[in-house]
Amino acid sequence: MNVRDHTKEFNVPTNTRKHHDIFPQNIFCVIAGSTGSGKTNLLVHLLKKEKLLNYNHIYVYSATLHQPAYAHLREYYGTLEKQIQQELNQSIQIAHFFEADNQIQNPSELDTNKNHVMIFDDVMMEHQDIIKQYFCQGRHNNVNVFYLCQSLHTIAKHCIRDNANVFILFRQDDKTLKYFHETHISGDMDFSEFKQFCDGAWKKKHGCVVINIWD
């Protein structure tokens, strides 16, 4: 049966520009690693690297906004916002920073004509339901999510782990790595091969493994 492609006729939000080809159109990323592993430094790199991520606004929810990485981002975006204001003669806010216990904005409230990056770093457990909504419904609102955690076991399987399409793993213990292999990798390689691959990456300082689970 020949099926006509009607998707171009659908009234859906559009991304005018895509991310770099290494990422899917909408990113739902879990970054897992212990304290000091390099999670936040990697996040800063992703946000600042030219032509890597396409976004109009970022929202950061973190219990550790006092750490140097977020202080640096505040200064970086503050300078950028001032430059844009001078050039375009209009006020603009790109970056929004919130303590982890603040009420998280509902994804349905975001402007679907803009690209958004949501960052959840060490957020309170009572906010997990709204974060699940971002992983389940975010693509309809041009949302990209980066969820930073110390352990994959602390992440709700339903919605978050099941809908994540990118995993960035810093060093994990064998139990956690085996669990991740069983749920995401076992169809592509056996555990010993996967562990060898990860160990090779983790030998480097702040080394990590990036796993894209998307077509």
Predicted regions and their residues:
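An amphipathic, basic-hydrophobic helix/alpha-beta surface used to engage anionic
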Residues: I58
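Short secondary-structure boundary/capping segments
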Residues: H20-D21, E109, G200
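Conserved P-loop NTPase motor cores
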Residues: I27-L53, A63-P68, R74, Q85, ...
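Electropositive nucleic-acid engagement tracts
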Residues: L80-E81
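Pre-Walker A adenine-sensing motif
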Residues: D5-F23, V44
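Conserved AAA+ ATPase small/helical "lid" subdomain
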Residues: D188-D215
